[in-house]
């Protein structure tokens, strides 16, 4: 973030993240790692260029060689965007092959792209033709395979690399959370009967951008009868006195780190007994599920020891009990006990993992629901709660 003082040496973070990727590449005997997802290119290099726009098109990518350079293929020719970055060894302009840019020449341009990647693999791969790719259209994959490259999936590499944060990364996540929570405060101060859901949500956006944040991934704020079931996006509905207002920040703050917390508030007046029951239930769930976490636990053990969801709330339970968070929501995804055998996978909690502990509590056919979520760090001895925004004592 230019014209501001970072809380840590950003080059230390950049080198750590690149080293994490190469460690995972080495485990899987991969010579090259081709990244197009803007979150992964950010993790590898910290070079940014129209992050959200670049999610639409294959217009920018990074090739990380295990025993060679990191080459950034950028949108157009803007080498000033990587000046001073220790993680970019070579800067090139990407040979794009999506129809908007290439028109009828898409196949020819895709072959040119494949030739360029193949040449770098030949020069720096030591005879290893294994390349892992996070996401690429069939035209791009065909261009790689036409050059006898063995294409594999990069996501096991990137997700496991991103899962363990350095102390410096955690410091940046705290900075992002501070901005997120300032935005929550601005929303809560603006909450009064008559404000629309969209106008309230705008307070979070405004604060995030003003304080150096980047964007918000979702529009998950709803009020009153729109809170249950969960996942309705914010609207022009005017919030009424006595409504519960629930939101999930999904905020990409300063330095690109995601702050993902959820809160539920009462709009003026006194809560009903049902509102207090819903809130207390959601609060009990996330408190229990945070307190059981410790390094060395398997994901299955977490699921088995998790808070048992009452039958009346099972149908509308959140899609995941716990998930990782870093530059975005990420590995791991730990399912609830009833879902684990059918949809879950196992793994181990490790120090340095940053996780979000989720709850949505709303009965099928009920008028309202409560969404709560906390962000935590797995330490050497247990868990530290990173998010500090207060809960609503009047609802407990």
How does the language model describe each region?
Residues 1-396:
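Active-site neighborhoods and metal-handling regions in enzymes and metal-associated proteins
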């Amino acid at each position: 973030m230019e014209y501001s003082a970072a809380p840590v040496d950003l080059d230390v973070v950049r080198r750590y993240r690149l080293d994490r990727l190469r460690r995972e590449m080495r485990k899987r005997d991969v010579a090259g790692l081709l990244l197009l997802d803007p979150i992964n290119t950010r993790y590898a290099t910290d070079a940014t260029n129209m992050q959200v726009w670049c999610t639409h098109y294959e217009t920018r990518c990074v090739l990380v060689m295990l025993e060679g350079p990191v080459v950034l293929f950028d949108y157009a020719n803007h080498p000033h965007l990587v000046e001073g970055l220790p993680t970019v060894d070579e800067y090139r302009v990407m040979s794009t092959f999506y129809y908007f840019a290439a028109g009828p020449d898409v196949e020819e341009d895709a072959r040119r792209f494949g030739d360029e990647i193949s040449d770098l693999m030949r020069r720096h791969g030591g005879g290893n033709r294994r390349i892992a790719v996070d996401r690429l259209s069939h035209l791009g994959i065909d261009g790689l395979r036409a050059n006898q490259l063995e294409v594999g999936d990069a996501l096991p590499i990137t997700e496991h690399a991103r899962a363990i944060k350095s102390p410096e990364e955690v410091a940046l996540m705290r900075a992002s959370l501070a901005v997120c929570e300032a935005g929550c405060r601005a929303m809560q101060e603006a909450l009064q009967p008559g404000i629309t859901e969209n106008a309230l949500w705008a307070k979070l956006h405004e604060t995030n951008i003003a304080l150096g944040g980047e964007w918000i991934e979702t529009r998950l704020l709803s009020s009153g009868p729109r809170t249950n079931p969960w996942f309705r996006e914010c609207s022009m509905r005017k919030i009424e006195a006595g409504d519960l207002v629930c939101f999930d920040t999904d905020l990409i703050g300063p330095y690109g780190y995601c702050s993902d917390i959820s809160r539920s508030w009462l709009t003026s007046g006194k809560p009903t007994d049902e509102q207090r029951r819903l809130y207390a239930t959601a609060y009990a769930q996330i408190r229990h599920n945070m307190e059981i976490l410790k390094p060395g636990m398997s994901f299955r053990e977490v699921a088995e020891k998790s808070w048992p969801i009452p039958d009346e709330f099972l149908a509308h339970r959140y899609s995941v009990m716990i998930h990782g968070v870093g530059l975005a929501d990420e590995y791991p995804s730990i399912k609830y006990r009833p879902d684990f055998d059918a949809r879950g996978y196992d793994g181990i909690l490790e120090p340095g993992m940053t996780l979000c502990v989720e709850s949505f509590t709303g009965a099928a056919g009920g008028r309202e629901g409560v969404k709560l979520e906390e962000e935590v760090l797995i330490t050497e001895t247990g868990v530290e709660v990173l998010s500090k925004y207060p809960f609503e004592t009047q609802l407990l």
